[in-house]
């Protein structure tokens, strides 16, 4: 099989000190010291509408007020014709040519806002430069040093319009035909000279539309687009970052100074925080006929993948009829039987956790504040059963005073805190029936699944336990996990724990039809080390107590790393077994620069690769993905 390396791009230097933009750094050169300033070329043609006039708030039922320009149906039809024409050009040694390795095109950056900056904007930009130059520490910690964080395949990429890709191995299974695999992840459009954490990049969706059964001969189509959050639009129009990020923008005195500059920008009308100041870079959810890009620091953003062209568009923030006024978890749970969606939000002010749900039509229910959480904690994920919701309270906490007094981050670990699991009836209207169970040393970032046993008297939770939680934000390469099965006896209050595997597994997925119900198999990314994923493992939970429960594993080879696997059930040719389906993910070869979409047989003892698609552009390492079926794509609300 021929392997093609994308053209390596060098880091370009700029005289401007406002921002820096990274091009792809080849692995061999990624460790070399970089210039503290990077240039970003601007297109001086037509400037798009300002951010204030180009965002959309979606409600449920659908009510739109102002903003993001949507493609018209005529534009979609033109794109269909253009994509189909392009597809005829691709041929390889097996009848198709390898895709072009030219760099993806970036949408033109507006020049008007930068060239005609107002006096208040100029003043605030100057203050940012003072902070960057004189207040930021001369040496940033590795976890927030952009020259350390954004190297190799963590370097951001440009947007990629819908581009055909050849299938270079096997054949796409019929159960995937016509659907799209979409992966979310951080991809900063600007990089400040100040600190930057991996979690803080703008969200970019990398969508691979697979050909439908009726379109024989067509190729899959890859499209990479930014989620156009209000923050993204404001900074795009400004030509530089203007809003601090949660994990890197509020460190020490410099963080407080940046907060003051943001306040000045708000008071002078440069931005409106009510439009949202957060990211949508973590995950995706398909619910009530809409596809959402999710991040904990803002409301969900409605996005759409065109079922014919593969184009990805942002349609605006969704407040669900004005009932969702703050952000929510990036890991909501959709009950596969009832169609309901369960979610929560957390924050630095009481109530530190609030639980809520949506009915199958997308109507949000009442908030249930959880006042028994007495300290602001980092609560990234949770679990549901048929009758309960389970909340983990871990040792990562919010500590604003550490930023003020110690010059540290407002988010850090508290080794003296005892982790707990909170159990509440999932249809509770208040927290009066909330029960907490101490589980020392049990720190989870992601849950696998939960269910009820013994007639509802016992709850079972499966999750990777982060054994070195103090490194989860600062030294991810030192993080190690052990997957555990935790059993909570609601009658006696006794909690028992059984280790299932100690292979540094995280980013778990299951067959989504079993969410909240007893299931047997889970699939995990294998840290090599974290945050890189060097392989995929399959665990059999029924083997609990027999030692290592790993029953299948695939390593992608030296220098090859993947993202989170996603399980797609085979509802076409399968026999209905839980593991009847396929695992899909993107894989990057750091030696050659080659990128693939990989399909693995979830039933095989070695997770056999049954199909590969060669991608025309680089897909950076990211977070969570989703497979959307052809029927779901076609039923998306406009």
UniProtKB/Swiss-Prot annotation:
Please verify whether the record's keywords include Iron: yes
Q: What is its induction?
A: Induced by glucose. Induced by drought stress. Down-regulated by submergence.
Record's cofactor remark: Binds 1 Fe(2+) ion per subunit.
List the GO molecular function terms: 9-cis-epoxycarotenoid dioxygenase activity; carotenoid dioxygenase activity; metal ion binding
The record's region (Disordered) falls at 28-80, 92-113
Q: Where in the cell is it found?
A: Plastid, Chloroplast
Q: Where is the composition biased (Low complexity)?
A: 28-37, 44-69, 92-102
Give the residues the record marks as binding Fe cation. 331, 380, 446, 624
Q: What is its EC number?
A: 1.13.11.51
Cofactor(s) this protein cannot do without: Fe(2+)
- Catalysed transformations (reactions): a 9-cis-epoxycarotenoid + O2 = a 12'-apo-carotenal + 2-cis,4-trans-xanthoxin; 9-cis-violaxanthin + O2 = (3S,5R,6S)-5,6-epoxy-3-hydroxy-5,6-dihydro-12'-apo-beta-caroten-12'-al + 2-cis,4-trans-xanthoxin; 9'-cis-neoxanthin + O2 = (3S,5R,6R)-3,5-dihydroxy-6,7-didehydro-5,6-dihydro-12'-apo-beta-caroten-12'-al + 2-cis,4-trans-xanthoxin
Keyword presence, Mitochondrion:
no
GO CC annotations on file: chloroplast stroma
Targeting signal (transit peptide) range: 1-80
The UniProt keywords, alphabetically, are: Abscisic acid biosynthesis, Chloroplast, Dioxygenase, Iron, Metal-binding, Oxidoreductase, Plastid, Stress response, Transit peptide
Superkingdom is: Eukaryota
Query: What does this protein do, in the record's words?
Result: Has a 11,12(11',12') 9-cis epoxycarotenoid cleavage activity. Catalyzes the first step of abscisic-acid biosynthesis from carotenoids.
User: Which protein family is named in the record?
Assistant: Belongs to the carotenoid oxygenase family.
What name does this protein carry? Answer: 9-cis-epoxycarotenoid dioxygenase NCED1, chloroplastic
* Biological source species: Oryza sativa subsp. japonica (Rice)
Q: Which gene is this protein's source?
A: NCED1
């Amino acid at each position: 099989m021929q392997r093609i390396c994308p053209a390596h791009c060098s880091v370009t230097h700029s005289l401007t000190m406002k921002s820096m933009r990274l091009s792809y750094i080849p692995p061999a050169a990624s460790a070399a010291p970089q210039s503290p300033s990077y240039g970003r070329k601007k297109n001086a043609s037509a400037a798009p509408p300002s951010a204030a006039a180009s965002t959309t708030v979606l409600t449920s039922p659908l009510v739109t007020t102002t903003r993001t320009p949507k493609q018209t149906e005529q534009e979609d039809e033109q794109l269909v014709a253009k994509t189909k024409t392009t597809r005829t050009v691709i041929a390889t040694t097996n009848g198709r040519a390898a895709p072009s390795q030219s760099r993806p095109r970036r949408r033109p950056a507006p020049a008007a806002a930068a060239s005609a900056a107002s006096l208040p904007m100029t003043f605030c930009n100057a203050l940012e430069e003072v902070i960057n130059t004189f207040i930021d520490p001369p040496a940033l910690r590795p976890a927030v040093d952009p020259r350390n964080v954004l190297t190799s395949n963590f370097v951001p990429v440009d947007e990629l319009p819908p581009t055909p890709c050849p299938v270079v191995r096997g054949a796409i299974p019929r159960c995937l035909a016509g659907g799209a695999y979409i992966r979310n992840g951080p991809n900063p459009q600007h990089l400040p000279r100040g600190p930057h954490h991996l979690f803080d990049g703008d969200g970019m969706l990398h969508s691979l539309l697979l050909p439908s059964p009726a379109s024989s001969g067509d190729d899959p189509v890859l499209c990479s687009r930014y989620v156009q959050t209000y923050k993204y639009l404001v900074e795009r129009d400004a030509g530089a970052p203007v809003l601090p990020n949660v994990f890197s923008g509020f460190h020490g005195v410099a963080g407080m100074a940046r907060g003051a500059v943001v306040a000045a920008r708000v008071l002078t009308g440069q931005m409106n925080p009510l439009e949202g100041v957060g990211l949508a870079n973590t995950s995706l959810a398909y619910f009530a006929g809409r596809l959402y890009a999710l991040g904990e620091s803002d409301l969900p953003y409605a996005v759409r993948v065109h079922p014919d062209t593969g184009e990805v568009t942002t349609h605006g923030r969704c407040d669900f009829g004005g009932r969702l006024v703050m952000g929510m978890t990036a890991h909501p749970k959709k009950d596969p039987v009832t169609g309901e969606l369960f979610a929560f939000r957390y924050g630095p002010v009481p109530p530190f956790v609030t639980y809520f749900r949506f009915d199958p039509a997308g109507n949000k229910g009442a908030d249930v504040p959880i006042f028994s959480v007495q300290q602001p904690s980092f609560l990234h994920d949770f679990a549901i059963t048929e009758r309960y919701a389970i909340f983990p309270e871990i040792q990562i906490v919010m500590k604003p005073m550490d930023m003020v007094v110690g010059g540290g981050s407002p988010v850090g670990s508290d080794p003296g805190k005892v982790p707990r699991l909170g159990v509440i009836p999932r249809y509770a209207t208040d927290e009066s029936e909330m029960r907490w169970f101490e589980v020392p040393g049990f720190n989870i970032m992601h849950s696998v699944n939960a269910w009820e046993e013994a007639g509802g008297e016992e709850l079972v939770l499966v999750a990777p336990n982060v054994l070195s939680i103090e490194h989860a934000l600062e030294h991810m390469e030192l993080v190690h996990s052990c997957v555990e099965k935790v059993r909570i006896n609601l009658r006696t209050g006794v909690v028992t724990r059984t280790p299932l595997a100690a292979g540094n597994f995280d980013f778990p997925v299951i067959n989504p039809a079993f969410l909240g119900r007893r299931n047997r198999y889970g699939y995990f990314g294998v840290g090599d080390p974290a945050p890189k994923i060097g392989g995929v493992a399959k665990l059999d939970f029924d083997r609990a107590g027999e030692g290592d429960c790993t029953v299948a594993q695939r390593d992608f080879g030296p220098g090859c790393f993947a993202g989170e696997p996603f399980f797609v059930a085979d509802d076409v040719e399968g026999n209905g077994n839980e593991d009847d389906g396929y695992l899909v993910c993107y894989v990057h070869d750091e030696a050659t620069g080659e990128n693939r979409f990989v399909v693995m047989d979830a039933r095989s003892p070695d997770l056999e690769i049954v199909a590969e698609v060669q991608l025309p552009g680089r897909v950076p390492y990211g977070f969570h993905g989703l497979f959307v079926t052809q029927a779901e794509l076609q039923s998306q609300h406009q």
